[in-house]
């Protein structure tokens, strides 16, 4: 679907804030550590290509995505930086990955022949990173014996084992770091076993956003920063360690403002009724845009610095807010901020996500493609 701007609703993406965040992380890293900017899920809803390009300009050295489709979009935009496919790549997609110089995650011999065949026929060397399951129980090899066995199978002229990595399950826990250290020790044990067998792998990485901020002793050769690249924290306690700026804000303009009499129901299901004459503004956004129904009669938006309640059920394409408390007249030219930078007086994503009974990772990813992204 072609995204147009014929509707007064949009997402603002601050590339200056993104640059600030990348540089904050670069300054925070251990000297030998590189920064991978994770831009999967269309850059967490921010737009993968603009985010990737600016992140690299600001100092990131590597990109990370979940699947090959996401990486191909970045390659088609002319971005040539290394890209790691963090998830599984099926055999039928391996050739395209190798053709476009994408780095594959491998944790079994399932795709090994496809990788070798692709590299041989394309006259290229396939780069791979081995995935270790140190306690997430998702994908990866669990033991040093399994890793060594795979490493032995990978000793062919068609393949370059560039990296090995794991993923932390509980690094954002502000009450205990025990499980994170347990995972780190497991990963280190596997590294030691590989070295004892004579294997040396150049890039070892384990830190996600939370671990990158909280555990500098685990930075190793590279860190993978996803959610915090966008100025969002996996845990509130991490704000005390590293200053970041929220990159995304969600805005709209009213399509109608009207006075509604007392005792008048608003929207589907009659879940809200005015107590007095109220000034109600209708916004051209709804749950199809990621403006969740869970915010109905619970959430607030900001108009002229005033927090205005969302009233009635949020519809698929429209929603209503009560602007009665705004001190100035609200017009169709006024900007309503759904969420934005807390330091600028807007409702932060953390609050919106909590009211949606989810996490801000999901909140930003839910904003639909029909909401245009404006890069400022």
Swiss-Prot record:
It catalyses: L-alanine = D-alanine. It is an enzyme of class 5 (isomerase). CDD domains: PLPDE_III_AR. Gene3D superfamilies: Alanine racemase, Lyase, Ornithine Decarboxylase, Chain A, domain 1. The active site is at 40 (proton acceptor), 268 (proton acceptor). It comes from the Bacteria. Pathway: Amino-acid biosynthesis; D-alanine biosynthesis; D-alanine from L-alanine: step 1/1. Substrate binds at residues 138, 316. One of its GO terms (cellular component) is cytosol. InterPro entries: Ala_racemase, Ala_racemase/Decarboxylase_C, Ala_racemase_C, Ala_racemase_N, Ala_racemase_pyridoxalP-BS, PLP-binding_barrel. Its EC number is 5.1.1.1. GO terms for molecular function: alanine racemase activity; pyridoxal phosphate binding. The modification N6-(pyridoxal phosphate)lysine is found at residue 40. Keywords: Isomerase, Pyridoxal phosphate. The keyword Isomerase applies. Its cofactor is pyridoxal 5'-phosphate. The keyword Isomerase applies. PANTHER family: ALANINE RACEMASE, ALANINE RACEMASE, CATABOLIC-RELATED. Catalyzes the interconversion of L-alanine and D-alanine. May also act on other amino acids. Belongs to the alanine racemase family. This is Alanine racemase 1.
């Amino acid at each position: 679907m072609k995204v147009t701007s014929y509707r007064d609703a949009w997402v603002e993406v601050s590339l200056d804030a993104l640059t600030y965040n990348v540089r904050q992380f670069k300054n925070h890293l251990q000297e030998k550590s590189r920064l991978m900017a994770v831009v999967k899920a269309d850059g967490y809803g921010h737009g993968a290509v603009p985010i990737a390009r600016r992140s690299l300009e600001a100092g990131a050295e590597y990109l990370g995505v979940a699947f090959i489709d996401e990486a191909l979009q970045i390659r088609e935009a002319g971005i040539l930086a290394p890209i790691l496919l963090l998830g599984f790549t099926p055999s039928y997609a391996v050739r395209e990955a190798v053709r476009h110089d994408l780095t594959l995650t491998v944790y079994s011999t399932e795709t090994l022949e496809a990788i070798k065949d692709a590299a041989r026929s394309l006259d290229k060397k396939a780069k791979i990173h081995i995935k270790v399951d140190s306690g997430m129980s998702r994908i990866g090899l669990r033991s040093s014996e399994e890793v060594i066995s795979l490493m032995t199978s990978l000793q062919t002229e068609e393949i370059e084992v560039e990296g090995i990595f794991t993923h932390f399950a509980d690094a954002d826990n502000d009450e205990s770091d025990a499980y994170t250290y347990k995972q780190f020790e497991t990963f280190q044990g596997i590294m030691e076993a590989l070295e004892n067998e004579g294997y040396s792998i150049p890039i070892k990485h384990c830190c996600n956003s939370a671990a990158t901020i909280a555990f500098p002793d685990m930075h190793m050769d590279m860190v993978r920063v996803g959610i915090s690249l966008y100025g969002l924290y996996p845990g509130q306690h991490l704000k005390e360690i590293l200053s970041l700026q929220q990159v995304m804000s969600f805005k709209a303009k009213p399509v109608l403002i009207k006075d509604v009499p007392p005792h008048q129901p608003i929207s589907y299901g009659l879940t809200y009724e005015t107590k007095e004459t109220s000034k109600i503004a209708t916004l051209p956004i709804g749950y199809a845009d990621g403006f969740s129904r869970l915010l109905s009669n619970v959430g607030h938006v900001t108009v002229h610095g005033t927090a205005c309640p969302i009233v009635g059920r949020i519809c698929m394409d429209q929603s209503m807010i009560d602007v009665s408390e705004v001190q100035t007249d609200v017009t169709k030219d006024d900007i309503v901020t759904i969420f934005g930078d807390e330091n600028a007086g807007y409702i932060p994503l953390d609050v919106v996500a909590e009211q949606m009974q989810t996490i801000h990772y999901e909140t930003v990813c839910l904003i639909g493609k029909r909401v245009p992204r404006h890069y400022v």
